[in-house]
Amino acid sequence: MPSLTRRAFLSATTSAAVVGSAVPLVAQDKNKRSQLSQTAPRKEGNVNQNDLAICDTHQHLWDLTTFKLPWLKGDAVQKINRSFLMSDYLKLLGPHKVTKTVYMEVNVDPSQQTAEAEYVLGLCGQQDNPMCGAIIGGSLQSVEFAKYMEPFATNNRINGVRTVLHDPDRPKGMCLEKTFVENVQRLGDMGKTFDLCMRPGEISDGAKLGELCPKTTLVIDHCGNMPVNSDDKALRESWMKGMREAAARPNTFCKISGIIVTAKPNAWKPSDLEPNISFCLETFGIDRCLFGGDWPVCTLTAPLADWISALKEIVKHKPLDWQQKLFHDNAVRVYKVTEK
């Protein structure tokens, strides 16, 4: 079965998307956005949803004057083909209480991976922002990966590594090749995690990787990248099967992130996202799910604050301590996030 890549999906669906703070909301969508932002948060006693601390485990930043992002080209991503900095992010949180963030690598040119890691370590060392850790980029398919990781192996601000697996030049099954598996095992020995960002029809490979690397914590990004509006029944069945297999591995977790990008720009509502999100929450259980913002990529469909509001709307009937696990506590535990 042909598998859909995240960027191929973006190319097909987001040419008319709106970027968060840089572009005004279109007139036809103002009422819906306003209603979403004004939805009364769940309240228990004197505490409501907007009092909950949030750890955003998927904060992208990129400075295009410094880094090259080979994937950031074409009409689909034109509106995010500019620099996005911490100062931009901090202006977009709305009523939401983001107290910690974990940087997520941005698939820079491989020659710049070390520089990217050093850049975000600098941000982690500053007190004027909430970044407490980072998932850095790395080429786990390379025999040089161990050498690359040497400077970061004992740094507790480096929480883990990601290799994007859905790029066109990365074949199905790459994460199960011998060198790749050995490097994922090596991450476990270092106490680092590995993020799985892969095609929805290939999640079973991720489940197998979890079996081969029992000492390494794996986190499936973006609910497994299944488009919320897809009518491809075979793909959905393959995704669900893979997610169930992954959930059977106690070392594998699910990140509730990225899903908003697969919704219809300027024509989505929280109920469009709910089936995929509820499936993930039910399959993995609340103790193995964690929140991610995926900013600025999320802005191809919705501003960051609207994505957070939508997720709060979807889970509003859950107890606030349950929600605190999803939005904050699980992230701190899974990624071993430490205070500044």
Task: List the model feature ranges, each with a label.
Residues Q126-P130, R157, L212-T217, R249, ...:
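Short helix-capping segments at alpha-helix termini
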Residues S111-Q127, T216-I220, P270-E282, D306-I314:
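Short, electropositive alpha-helical surface patch
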Residues D63-V102, N155-P171, T216-T217, G224-N229, ...:
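Active-site gating loops and adjacent loop-to-helix segments of metal-dependent hydrolytic enzymes
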Residues S3-T57, F67-P70, D75-Q78, R82-K100, ...:
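Mid-to-C-terminal alpha-helical segments outside catalytic/metal-binding sites
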Residues T65, G173-L290:
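Catalytic pocket-lining loop regions of alpha/beta-barrel enzymes
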Residues H58, T101, A134, L187, ...:
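Conserved, mostly hydrophobic/aromatic
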Residues Q59, V106, C223, D294-W295:
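Active-site metal-binding loops of divalent metal-dependent hydrolases
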Residues Q38, S111-E202, K208-E211, G224, ...:
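Active-site gating/metal-coordination segments in enzymes
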